[in-house]
Amino acid sequence: MGFSFGLLIWAPMAFGRAGARSNLISDNYLTFVSVYALLLLSDVLFWNCFGFDRSAVQAYFLAPLKMSTVLLGKNVAAICLIFLEITGVSVVCALLRLPLSGLKILEAFSITCVVTLLILSIGNLSSLYNPRPVNPSKSFRTAAGGRTQAMLMVAFPLALLPVALAFLARYAFDSEWALFGVLFVGAALGAVVYAYSMSAAVQAAEDRKERIITALSQGEGPIET
């Protein structure tokens, strides 16, 4: 979704007007598309990562497997998918001869990495405190619950705060080094937050085991209960 919709939605705003070739969106087109892809995929990859497992989630609690390993595996899979999508968008932008450079690609990957790290920190907890079974045939609009959409409206701007500070630093110091410096600090803080949220998520999984299985077993699922 982010690959197709991101390119189609942001392209008119970035390059649609004559003489508007140099503005915030066009200069950072790949970054905008990458962050938009995160937004579109956030419910499946972050906020409710056990949704498609549904009743099969009980296998995670029955198998001799640590919940931290399960969460880490899902997080790594989400990161790989996001980075694969950004790579695809970068290739398409290059083929279409859109304004693109090695620095802009590095910037887009760096920003996406920081935002993803912060979203994963929140999403691991959300997936265990607000688990919902998801039907793969349903769209994002019908699959995401009201509580999840409200959380997205609050959490996503918070995750974008280091990015906003990085852009402000680049504007203030007129230097790309300032942007990457702020992003590095944001990544370091994000790593600390992620480590804390992982331990909290593991504890939540242990304390809420029955409620998680019950919530995800509602309706049809891969395992009959």
Regions found by a protein language model. Name each.
Residues 1-58, 67-225:
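Hydrophobic alpha-helical transmembrane segments of membrane proteins
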